[in-house]
Amino acid sequence: MEYSQIHKFDLKAYDSILFISKSIGTYCAAKLAHEYKLTANIYFTPLDFTLEYLQQKDLVYSGTKDQWANFDKIEHYCIYHLIEFHSIVDGNHSLETGNIQTDIENLKQIMYRVETFIHSL
């Protein structure tokens, strides 16, 4: 895969690099992390073809009703490969459930875990 912009940076100059990505961006971030041996990543609603590049040090969120990804496949892959996985019950590809109160509570929990995850790196 050719990354015309990434070559402008000396990635070895950084102690850690964290990508936070969503949907199709999870594939790009995961492939970059794999190829350049980067630090952990946070993936929101990854697509099925992203899975082969996920690593144990990653954090993954997926909705149980994601219309663009196979939730069961992602969940099983993460569990089998010991990747931290969080499901959003009734969440779609935007992790929205259709209930604003539930969505706000989910978002609070997600952001708390993202914050602690980042501080743990």
What are these regions (language model features)?
Residues 16-19, 41:
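Conserved alpha/beta-hydrolase fold motif
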Residues 91-106:
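Catalytic histidine-centered segment of alpha/beta-hydrolase-like enzymes
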Residues 19-30:
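Gly/Ala-rich beta-loop-alpha elbow adjacent to hydrolase catalytic centers
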Residues 36-48, 56-57:
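A conserved short beta-strand
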Residues 64-69, 93-94:
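Acidic catalytic loop of the alpha/beta-hydrolase fold
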Residues 1-16:
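Serine-hydrolase catalytic machinery in alpha/beta-hydrolase-like enzymes
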Residues 109, 113-121:
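C-terminal alpha-helix
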Residues 54, 58-62, 66, 74:
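Short beta-strand/loop motif that positions the catalytic acidic residue
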